[in-house]
């Protein structure tokens, strides 16, 4: 069953790449049509090349070198593989809905995608806590999914803004956009501080910097909101960067102590007498 799911995921992933490639010329214009004030500059979306490259490594490793796959060591490996299959289907579903202007359905699909990736990411960080960091497994199996999940966090919040703007028929208030950016910042800081996940933090910085340097030409009222949002994005990127430096420094400077716990201690009192020469205690 495990091998079947691994190959099914590879097939679904290839199909996902085909669907993305076929729709690549449509997604850009649709994104500009439903652009929000927290949508990063166009160059930021080039991160998909990185994501798809390392996700390819994830599914290929699971098929051919399963000992390096984070799926294999999981007690519920088949459930995790099924969740990855769901993520592929939701990715393709989002493309179909969004390119056909079903904005609300696209957002709902993205939420399901987020939950499936969150479950996979939660397993990765839990296993890393229990078994330690393995550089090979990280690069060839975990990295693609970590970056994918981090970017999906940003994309889901942007999609919420798209839906809200679509319903309102106008841009949102400054506080609404700042609230969405705050959710991204808090989630990222949690990953960096509690899990030491530098990769997650770097993806968030990429999205925030892409927003901070974005150039817009809007009416005066909206342009003022956009300027404030870019200032918030700049500040958030700086804060996340600072905590990444702190996390890395802490890792480098904290000695890795390994203690061997005592299996048993000498009894303080027992029924059996202890001989000390000719004297008994």
Q: Model regions: which residues?
A:
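N-terminal membrane topogenic signal
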Residues: 1-10, 48, 202, 232
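Alpha-helical transmembrane segments of multi-pass membrane proteins
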Residues: 13-28
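Short aromatic-rich membrane-water interface segments that cap or initiate transmembrane helices
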Residues: 34-47, 138-145
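Membrane-interface transmembrane-helix boundary segments in multi-pass integral membrane proteins
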Residues: 39-44, 170-187, 193, 212-245
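Membrane-interface helix caps and helix-loop-helix hairpins in membrane proteins
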Residues: 94-108, 166-171, 192-195
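Alpha-helical transmembrane segments in multipass membrane proteins, preferentially the mid-helix core
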Residues: 118-127, 152-166, 180-195
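Central hydrophobic cores of alpha-helical transmembrane segments
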Residues: 200-211
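Non-transmembrane, juxtamembrane loop and terminal tail segments
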Residues: 256-281
